[in-house]
Amino acid sequence: MGEARKNWNPQQALNGQSQVSRVQLNHASELLQSMDPALHQASHDPFGAQAMVFTLLLSQQEDGCREQMSALEENGHAALVQEMGRLLPHIRAMDARTKLPLVDLAIPSLRQLSPAQFEAFSQTLQWLIESDQQIDLFEFALQKVVERHLRHHFVAQSRQAPSHHVILPLLPHAQVLISGFAHIGHDQAAATQLAFERGIAQLGELGKKLTLLPFDQCNLPQMNEAIEHLNLATPGLRQRIIFSLAHTVGADGSVTLKEAELLRAFADALDCPIPPHVDTPIETQPT
């Protein structure tokens, strides 16, 4: 059995780019009401917010978690480790769907850090992500949320003028993203191929010439590299890429939590943010 899936309509999801629906507002309210009070309280304090985000990144393996906490303590973060230890059981017990919303809740508090504190926070965040020698989908999504909503706040950055005004030179990079999303969301070859075809169909006739890449040519580092190129496109082209990814995700009419989080991360990275997808979970299906 695979991850629980939700109903998914790409067009409705992307309509949310410009308007948050009543359903989404109600869902956000429900998430806040169901959130552990200890985590909710921590999110409203800069120190607690840092500890909470770091705790979300701790290894699920007991030995790995202990090693990470010890390393942080040895590097002068004893108070932080103590707070992380207090929050850990609350983090472990939380609904996975509330993890990114919890990070969102912490953003205003994290913006209260000084530039030096933010730099220290960023370094620790990166160390925790890399400490297990691999990056999972949640870590990647969290990293993109932090980059968009925090780094841009502390580090003045002006978006480079678009150098791509047509889709043609972007197709190889779009191919990497669409292939990656197709593989991540589906285990069966036929379903993966269908998802890829639904995605490239949104790119017009030129897109139909693209072929599905093997997963070792479209993993997260390669997808991240593709984003760097796609960010040089006009807003309309970037939104078109996100539209293609939404159709890749929704090829089977449903979406898993990891697919929804990854889509949100890439939409943030391309400066085409979309609100979290909410719908009624349906029966768990093989993915």
What is each residue range found by the language model?
Residues 1-130, 138-287:
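Small-residue-enriched hydrophobic alpha-helices in membranes
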